[in-house]
């Protein structure tokens, strides 16, 4: 599935207050789901000596899907095309790599 199709299908399942004019809801959802990814990774470190078994990976995969859903809906709320966001990110990283500036901090490296 491509990003355009995903964004359309994700939007079909969106149900939250002020749909179409509410960028706060998907932003908060994104942060919450990213926290759930981090929590699952933390538990692998704590409970499984850092070994990611199939069960752990599947749980993380589900949470990553939720992260993607919220990213997609936030893009829609902001009138961004998810595919354009992904391509712009890769172009930025390629430019940084060409300049030898992948490491470091700041948006304008």
What is the meaning of each model-derived region?
Residues 1-109:
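Flexible "arm" and connector segments at domain edges
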């Amino acid at each position: 599935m491509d990003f355009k199709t995903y964004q359309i299908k994700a939007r079909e399942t969106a149900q939250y207050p002020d749909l179409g004019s509410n960028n706060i809801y998907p932003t908060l959802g994104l942060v919450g789901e990213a926290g759930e990814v981090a929590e699952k990774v933390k538990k692998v470190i704590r409970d499984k000596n850092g070994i990611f078994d199939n069960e752990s990976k599947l749980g993380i995969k589900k949470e990553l899907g939720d992260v993607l859903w919220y990213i997609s809906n936030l893009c829609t709320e902001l009138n961004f095309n998810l595919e354009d966001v992904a391509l712009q990110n890769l172009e930025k990283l390629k430019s940084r790599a060409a300049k030898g500036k992948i490491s470091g901090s700041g948006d304008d490296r």
